[in-house]
Regions:
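Vicinal oxygen chelate
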Residues: 1-8, 12-20, 47-49, 64-87, 91-131
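Core segments of cupin and vicinal oxygen chelate
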Residues: 2, 9-54, 90
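Short, flexible segments with low predicted structural confidence
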Residues: 1-2, 57-60, 72
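Intrinsic, low-complexity N-terminal interaction/targeting segments
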Residues: 39-66, 83-86, 95
Length: 131
């Protein structure tokens, strides 16, 4: 099995759209880019795929985001999310979403860098697995 480059430390590995209108977003992006979508059982989450490969997701924005424009978020793979989160904080990052476990996926942390950009880091449960 070949290594998935997106699972290497420092690689962009996942994108998610938070929007007030999930159905409209699904229609737009499937028509525009040829993506396919698949509902994730037991979650309010739509998996976005190109071919057989999951590349991201679409989900409803939380109530506290009412009035905010839809936005894409990106995840960067790291070898140790806890250590990298501590390092980000030491370098001046502000926590947006604290360290959080995603069942059967991994653990992530979302922060705002000192310049104001928001990004998420993630360590996948099985770093050698395909996405």
């Amino acid at each position: 099995m070949s290594e998935n480059a997106m699972l290497r430390h420092g690689a962009f590995s996942w994108c998610e759209l938070m929007t007030a209108d999930v159905e409209a977003a699904k229609r737009f992006y499937t028509e525009l880019l040829g993506w396919t979508t698949e509902e994730v059982p037991g979650m309010s989450y739509t998996l976005v795929k190109t071919g057989d490969t999951g590349i991201g997701g679409i989900m409803a924005a939380p109530p506290q985001a009412t009035g905010a424009p839809p936005q894409w978020g990106i995840y960067v793979t790291v070898d140790d999310v806890d250590a990298t989160a501590r390092k980000a904080q030491a370098l001046g990052a502000t926590t947006i979403v604290p360290l959080t476990d995603i069942p059967n996926v991994g653990r992530f942390y979302t922060f705002q860098d000192p310049q104001g950009a928001v990004i998420s880091i993630i360590t996948y449960r099985m770093q050698g697995a395909s996405l």
